[in-house]
Amino acid sequence: EYIDEDSWVDFVIVQEISKNIDGNLKTSCWMYKERDENKLYMTALWDFDLAYGIVNWSNADEERNDASDCPGSGTYEDFMIINSSCPWIKKLYQQDEFRELLTERYTCYRTTVIAELQALIAEQAAYLAKAEDANYKLWKKNFSLGVANLQTWLNGRLEWLDEVWLIEN
């Protein structure tokens, strides 16, 4: 009765797909409440520099982002924000109604929005490939390898989440 379940479910799905360390409600999360309502809404997803398997603790604020709270943050398996030391998400996930809504929504998104995300990555990588030489000269990073790593990591993460959340028809 105190949260907008739809916005919170979407928030958890996005943060868990990306395994975003900053999505733990301690640093980079925005919420709002309508003046005439008692519900808290999640909004404005942002700050994904420590997500999608890219975990560089030299750039992270270990105290605020809980480096010790996120073991295995670069792997495909296990939950990130559900298992963080911030109890709100874990408490929500322990409620059957919330978890059922989450798995239903994930199942729906898996064949639509998530499939579109994977196609968008490939499409944008092809478009940006024209600038790959300039990118390498500036950053000394291999763009194609970075895209391949992202796709491999995302596919592995989705396979793991499918085992946990995907509803078989």
Regions found by a protein language model. Name each.
Residues 1-25, 29-169:
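Middle-to-C-terminal accessory/interaction subdomains
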